[in-house]
Amino acid sequence: MEPPDARAGARRAPRLLVLALLLAAPPGSKAEVRLSVPPLVEVMRGESVTLDCSPLGTHDYFMLEWFLVDRSGARHRLASAELRGSELRDKELNSRGRSPPYQLDSQGRLVLPEAQVGDERDYVCVVKAGAAGTAEATARLKVFAKPEAPEVSPNKGILSVMDDFAQEIATCSSRNGNPAPQIMWYRNGQPLAVPLEVNSEGYMTTRTVREASGLLSLTSTLYLRLHKPDREASFHCSVHYYLPAGQHGRLDGPSFSLTLHYPTEHVLFWLGSQSTAEGWVREGDSVQLLCQGDGSPTPEYTFFWLQDKQEDVLKTSLEGNLTLERVQRNQSGTYGCRVEDFDVPEDAELSKTLELRVAYLDSLELSAGEELSLPLHNSTTVTCSARGLPTPTLYWTKDSAPMGEDPTLSLHSVTFDSAGTYTCEAYMPRIPLLSRTRSFRLLVQGTPELKAKETQPKAEGSWTEGDEVTLICYARGYPKPKLTWSQLGGSPTEPAPGGQGWVSSSLTLKVTSALSQDGVSCEASNPLGNTHHVFHFGTVAPQTSQAGVAVMAVAISVALLLLVVAVFYCMRRKGRPGCCQWGEKGSPPPGEPKLSHSGSQRPEQTGLLMGSASGGAKHGSGGFGDEC
């Protein structure tokens, strides 16, 4: 086995040869080798990167070496090789514990698989080309890592706006980035320009930590002096990081708000229940009084009722509401709310008052009772009285038809048309759903008024005896009239369709000649009198005899039947000699024997009888005998 020193000497032999060639170069010759090496190479963490080192021009032979420059400036060889023509020989690699190890490709370029933050160094490429000389160039590797999304820890406590110094708002952290990212703070979407120097208005502090992986984590804490408008502000932080080729990225953290302590400055006091603009509520309703101050935390509220300039405390609570159940008219007055906030100056006015007006409307009173009887053509007045607050408006209706706005109803020379239901209604235009009504019924006394429904005859101009007719009478009055007829069969008196006090009765009968003389009368009566109407029928035509018409119809029907039978028989015997032919004087055809029957029997009948008696003697399709 060959000793190690011998093998090392064999490897050094070509290098010594190259060195000898370089030393043997003619004096005065100019050696020049130029390299193409990118001064800065950028890569994302975890990606593979290749560092190029290419001599410019044509060189049949050169020696290539790659060095790593540490933080102290010392060089450490990573790889070496010789290039003869296009063939790379005698490669040597020293990974210095890197995993995965460095690689050298076929063109002498240094390959770093899965770039890490620790690979951020200067890499020196040295080329020795014999007589052409020696050259070296440095490539700086920059490794970028996208940081994790920011995590925010807001201050969960209650922050006072009355403090005159900046308070801690929140802390924002971003981990594992490279190079170190930047953290910015925002309020309502607008960036906060806060310095790093401590002051009373606002500043921020930052801290950077290098993790074991070589990545950087950044933490920023925001301090601000708070004001009352910040109670509705939205805060968040964002991380700005760098990418290759001058690009930038941004990651936003979740937004948050703060819980602030600030004194009450304004108080609102209003009616929460349905009410008018003037503060009117209906008697019997439940009324809610609402009070709200703009301080935080929620202050204490005191509700009171002013009576003779003295406060009658009704309730003290944190809810800011007071409910008055089923308010009455004597609860009208001035109500107030006061905010008990001990953080405000003593001279601050933190109370409000409002006027509560309870609207009421008592039952209506009429000068007439529920029913008013008045003789026909008499006159009277009815007065409607209402008591309420605010003053109600009165108007009258008759059977739901409006009559006008006036507390007094005047009835002049009443007729039966005046009878009906009169209603007085009181309402308040400014207060919805507050109204009352009171009604009375007017009864007009008098002899009944009668109206008949005339009928017209069926035949134009006159009635015919036996025609059926229905007669109808209508009547109205008070007391209620009764309808009777001069003939039996009238229907009972019933209210007529359409109302208005009318009643009706009907009678159905047949017209006779006796009715044409006397007619039919209808009478309406009540204790005050009666009225009647007579239905006249005029001339009544006698009825046509129905028996003669029936006999004539039967005779015509029989004659038509015999004619049809004769025609049918002749058509069946058409073409036979002597058939269906008679002499001029009605004698039988020649050659036929004379019948010994009575002379009243006709030949056609004889022929039919003979044919029928012949039984099975059939010829042709007729089915009758051969005799005519």
Curated annotation (Swiss-Prot):
GO biological process: one example: angiogenesis
Pfam families: C2-set_2, Ig_3
GO terms for cellular component: plasma membrane
Major localization class: membrane
InterPro entries xrefs: CD80_C2-set, Ig-like_dom, Ig-like_dom_sf, Ig-like_fold, Ig_sub, Ig_sub2, Surface_Rcpt/Adhesion_Mol
GO MF annotations in UniProt: laminin receptor activity
Keyword field: Cell adhesion, Cell membrane, Disulfide bond, Glycoprotein, Immunoglobulin domain, Membrane, Phosphoprotein, Receptor, Repeat, Signal, Transmembrane, Transmembrane helix
Domain named Ig-like V-type: residues: 32-142, 150-253
Transmembrane regions: 548-568
Cysteine-cysteine disulfides: 53-125, 172-237, 291-337, 384-424, 473-522
Job description of the protein: Transmembrane glycoprotein that functions as both a receptor and an adhesion molecule playing a crucial role in cell adhesion, motility, migration and invasion. Extracellular domain enables binding to extracellular matrix proteins, such as laminin, integrin and other ligands while its intracellular domain interacts with cytoskeletal proteins like hemoglobin, facilitating cell signal transduction. Serves as a receptor for laminin alpha-5/LAMA5 to promote cell adhesion.
Subunit structure, interactors included: Homodimer. Interacts with ITGA4:ITGB1. Interacts with spectrins SPTA1 and SPTB1.
Protein name (database record): Basal cell adhesion molecule
Protein source organism: Bos taurus (Bovine)
Top-level taxonomy: Eukaryota, Metazoa, Chordata, Craniata, Vertebrata
Name of the gene: BCAM
